[in-house]
Amino acid sequence: MDGIKKKMIAMKLEKENAMERAVQYEAQLKQKEEEQEKKETEIGELNNRMKQAQTELDEIQEALQDSLNKMEETDKRATNAEAEVARMTRRIRLLEEDLEVSSSRLTETLAKFDEASKTAEESERGRKELEIRSIADDEGLSQLEDQQKEGKYIAEDADRKYDEAARKLAIVEVDFERAESRLEAAESKIVELEEELRVVGNNMKALEISEQESAQREESYEETIRDLTERLKAAEQRAAEAERQVSKLQNEVDHLEDDLLSEKIRYKDLSGGLDQTFAELTGY
């Protein structure tokens, strides 16, 4: 009888210990589940941060590409403007050369005209002298007539030369007027080109400023990208560490659940043994 009582007391103590361990296991299990839930929440937040960082990185890369495209387009416009300026400069140089040629031709024609005028004046003076001599000396009339004819021929030849010089002068004047028109057009174009050059210069200054700002923005973008990349790597490392901790907690939870199940089985066995012992005592 004493042995049965001792056995009952021992079984009761073991039952109480088993219940206490079961309560501890349940508390630990609850704590581990809370920790696991917390870690899963942290993993979700990290995933959201990683997605946000990736989105920001994509936006920055897109903005950087847009800036590079704008810089390329601006450089292309500046190159085209420089080519246009060079082309117009060549045209101005050709016009200036044409004007020099026309001026030279005009000077040459005027010189020939002066020479023809002098020849005509000399012929006229010779004719008048012949007329005077013919009046003064009847005997030399025939000679004077010959001289008069010669003078007339010289005068006619001078007139022809004068007409030819006048015709050439008219042509030169037309060429000169055209050259003046081209010169005026060239001067107007020069003014226009100077204005365009001024605008291009201002645009180039603006482009240089924009390029400097773009370079600064690019450096800022690159720094932001590096920062985001580091943050992304850190977030990935934290996420991996959190997943490892969750896996570890899951293993601990599984182990605690196994221990709790074992304790419940032991408790059930002890309860069965106590019931059997009570039945035996009742039988006595």
Curated annotation (Swiss-Prot):
Function: Tropomyosin, in association with the troponin complex, plays a central role in the calcium dependent regulation of muscle contraction.
Similarity remark: Belongs to the tropomyosin family.
Biased amino acid composition, Basic and acidic residues: 29-42, 111-136
Coiled coil: 1-284
InterPro entries (UniProt xref): Tropomyosin (IPR000533)
Pfam families reported in the protein's UniProt record: Tropomyosin
Protein name: Tropomyosin
Organism domain of life: Eukaryota
Taxonomic source organism: Clonorchis sinensis (Chinese liver fluke)
Region (Disordered): 29-49, 111-149
Gene3D superfamilies named among the record's database cross-references: 1.20.5.170, 1.20.5.340
